[in-house]
Amino acid sequence: MNRDQALLNRLWSRVLLEELSRLGVTQVCVAPGSRSTPLTLEANANTAFTLHTHYDERGLGFMALGLAKASQQPVAVIVTSGTAVANLLPAIAESKLTGERLVVLTADRPLELVGCGANQAIVQSGIFSSHVTASLELPSPAIHHPLSWLLTSIDEVMARQALLGGSVHINCPFPEPLYSAGDEAIYQPYLQPVQRWREQARPYTQVHQGLVQSVPAAIDGLLTKGVVIVGSLSLQEAQAAKRFAKAMGWPLLCDPQSGISSQWAHFDLWLQHPKAREQLNQAQCVVQFGSRIVSKRLLQWLEAWCATGLGEYHYIAPHSARNNPWHAMQQQWVCEISHWVDAVLSKRLAGQHTQQGWADELTHYAQSVRQLAQLHFSSSSLSEVALALDLTERATQADLFLGNSLIVRLVDIFSALDGREVFSNRGASGIDGLVATASGVQRARQKPLLMLLGDTSLLYDLNSLALMRNPAQPTVIVVTNNDGGAIFDLLPVPSEQREALYQMPHGMDFAHAASQFGLAYCAAQTLEHYQTLVEEHFAHGAGTLLIEVKTPPQQASMHIKQLTSQLHAL
């Protein structure tokens, strides 16, 4: 048989990508590079794929993360060899903690060119370490490696990903030449053993994984006073959890990432009140749906409650990752949340006594927080707390993406989001890649998007504003500029070094950045001005509007301390 390595590289890539398509991949994110040519050209030729491109691999990885987050489907990423691969690590580390499924296809030099001084060659095998769910180190394409082996190897790592979530890494060495106009007919004998697969549309290996739908055996643990905590979930999952709490008559404490709220909102503040905490301590059961709680006060209460050993702690999530940082006794249910709720309620409410309304008095504290906050921030004064309060009513038909650091904490404390699709990166909680992730979310959902993030976060991901130039739906990015890391005003860092080593003020604004990337820009002057900008852009605008809100560095922390002091006086 004649040999054409470039053609063989292409056939190998075609089979790999076709199998990924049959396993649910429809979105492929591509960065430029020559060594990845076989993968890039075959992805482009496969009509089942929608391609997204970006010149910055770090941003590309986060865009893929956003696509996977919003679509809840695996998303492929194609990059060339060398440091391009290393730039994907932040997004992969995030996906490890939050479960988004990335299929990372990294082109590589063949083995004989690694570690010998060849250009653009680093050790890529195992580069992502424990941050990936599974890895597959492919050999260079050769006819003595059967395509049936390639297919079953892909199916194995993808089945593991389907079960556990997170990213998989498939390293793909391609010898040169990489370009050819040769006739593929010379490789028909090589393709023949997988002819039946080529003629069908299903995966080579079909893995049928069981669903956990049984009624929990420990149902008696739910016959008492309970608390329901809702963490980072899709809106549909969160609404199932809310249905459970309502049926039980238990207090419902909702993280803003869930997109729902309740009468017990603003708990990060009222949990600091001794009487409120004392009443919540009467709980004899905690049922938590989803992970990644923002509120430090709620996490502290949960840790202290678990330490008493006086009740059952149930944790329900679709994936089996451990979510138990205080290592308490726990009943963990790995299943679809709606399945668990339906199973429990069908048995739990069959004429059995319930502790309905045992913690309704706590709603008084939530109302007090809301009233105090509105009293302080009902004027036209523009502040970060005012933005968080306003978010409850603002652009309610748009998807919401929350940045990390200070803004997500303010939203957690002061907002009461209900019925919103909320997205965030609260796995590793880094401030990198937030704009790119939001771009991926919108590309998947094709809906208007409102994003809130801080100035340092935007500086970190400035390159990714290029991804926001032509969104499918109107987009508003709100950057709160407090000139550095104002979050450190809430932390006990050394006061002498706070500004120089923690806050790191930069003295910049974002007008020229918006201009460079072709985005509309406006600096909001008052709260009413901000509200008008947001609503008019969503009603009549197109493209992306960057709204900058400048605030004094210590203002937010001062406001929180004032409200906390007044709440204690109640």
UniProtKB/Swiss-Prot annotation:
Record-annotated membrane-spanning stretches: none
Keyword check for Transmembrane: no
UniProt cofactor(s): Mg(2+); Mn(2+); thiamine diphosphate
SUPFAM superfamilies according to UniProt: Thiamin diphosphate-binding fold (THDP-binding)
Species whose genome carries this gene: Vibrio cholerae serotype O1 (strain ATCC 39315 / El Tor Inaba N16961)
Quaternary structure and interacting proteins, as annotated: Homodimer.
Physiological role: Catalyzes the thiamine diphosphate-dependent decarboxylation of 2-oxoglutarate and the subsequent addition of the resulting succinic semialdehyde-thiamine pyrophosphate anion to isochorismate to yield 2-succinyl-5-enolpyruvyl-6-hydroxy-3-cyclohexene-1-carboxylate (SEPHCHC).
Protein name in UniProt: 2-succinyl-5-enolpyruvyl-6-hydroxy-3-cyclohexene-1-carboxylate synthase
EC assignment: 2.2.1.9
InterPro entries: MenaQ_synth_MenD (IPR004433), MenD_middle (IPR032264), THDP-binding (IPR029061), Thiamin_PyroP_enz_TPP-bd_dom (IPR012001), TPP_enzyme_TPP-bd (IPR011766)
Pfam families the UniProt entry points to: TPP_enzyme_C, TPP_enzyme_M_2, TPP_enzyme_N
UniProt GO MF annotations: 2-succinyl-5-enolpyruvyl-6-hydroxy-3-cyclohexene-1-carboxylic-acid synthase activity; magnesium ion binding; manganese ion binding; thiamine pyrophosphate binding
Known pathway: Quinol/quinone metabolism; 1,4-dihydroxy-2-naphthoate biosynthesis; 1,4-dihydroxy-2-naphthoate from chorismate: step 2/7; Quinol/quinone metabolism; menaquinone biosynthesis
Gene that encodes the chain: menD
Catalytic activity line of the entry: isochorismate + 2-oxoglutarate + H(+) = 5-enolpyruvoyl-6-hydroxy-2-succinyl-cyclohex-3-ene-1-carboxylate + CO2
Keywords on record: Magnesium, Manganese, Menaquinone biosynthesis, Metal-binding, Thiamine pyrophosphate, Transferase
